[in-house]
Amino acid sequence: MFGHNSKVDLELNREVEKLIKTGGKEKIMPIVQAGEPVLRQQTIAYDGQLSRKTLDKLIDTMRTTMLEAPGVGLAATQIGLGLALAVVEDHVCEGDDGDPREAAEFPFHAIINPSYEPIGTETRSFYEGCLSFDGYQAVRKRWLDITARWQDEDGNKHEEHLHGWPARIFQHETDHLSGELYIDQAEIRSLTTNENLEDFWCEDPVPTEAAAELGFEL
């Protein structure tokens, strides 16, 4: 449980309250873009530094910001906050059956102090994007199956086997909290604008045609 051996950091709590207010009535906060130092910093583990009221407001505002963007994950660093906290949520669309990306329902979670480790050695390479590298996507190889670990808002510990697209989302957001952007290990020759992805490559979820035409390996 959070707070058992810790006290609220009053200064940090005030800073976070100010940050939340940048979202206005709509609760949509500005998203930090690549090049800002906070995205490259190792985050601080969360251990009750915020009041529960402030933590709940932060998580709610992060979720609204994520969904409005729209996105399926948002790390605290992406709103300029160096705490080990992210939100994730994704829902399967009609017609997704058979998609090689293996999308699956991923209900909303606030993931605090998350970590993961691969299960097995299988990887998959697909296009992915980032709200902090807006307007672009690139092919990134990631583990197909992971053991995901995190704490919830109450400090309860969770461990779950994630597979396919939910595993990719969890890896992406957890990496943010260690100062990593997906582009760091992406196939750089695959980099494309969202518009060009839609025009040229969206019919090929496994990017074999893009690999051949743009000159990268899967």
Curated annotation (Swiss-Prot):
Cofactor annotation comment: Binds 1 Fe(2+) ion.
Active site: residue positions: E173
Gene3D superfamilies found in the cross-reference section: Peptide deformylase (3.90.45.10)
Gene Ontology biological process terms, A to Z: co-translational protein modification; translation
E.C. number(s) listed in UniProt: 3.5.1.88
Record GO terms (molecular function): metal ion binding; peptide deformylase activity
Catalytic activity: N-terminal N-formyl-L-methionyl-[peptide] + H2O = N-terminal L-methionyl-[peptide] + formate
InterPro entries the UniProt entry points to: Peptide_deformylase, Peptide_deformylase_sf
Cofactor: Fe(2+)
Residues annotated to bind Fe cation: C130, H172, H176
Pfam families in the record: Pep_deformylase
Function description: Removes the formyl group from the N-terminal Met of newly synthesized proteins. Requires at least a dipeptide for an efficient rate of reaction. N-terminal L-methionine is a prerequisite for activity but the enzyme has broad specificity at other positions.
Family in the record: Belongs to the polypeptide deformylase family.
PANTHER family per the UniProt record, alphabetical: PEPTIDE DEFORMYLASE, PEPTIDE DEFORMYLASE, MITOCHONDRIAL
HAMAP family (UniProt xref): Pep_deformylase
Name of the protein described by the UniProt record: Peptide deformylase
Organism: Bifidobacterium adolescentis (strain ATCC 15703 / DSM 20083 / NCTC 11814 / E194a)
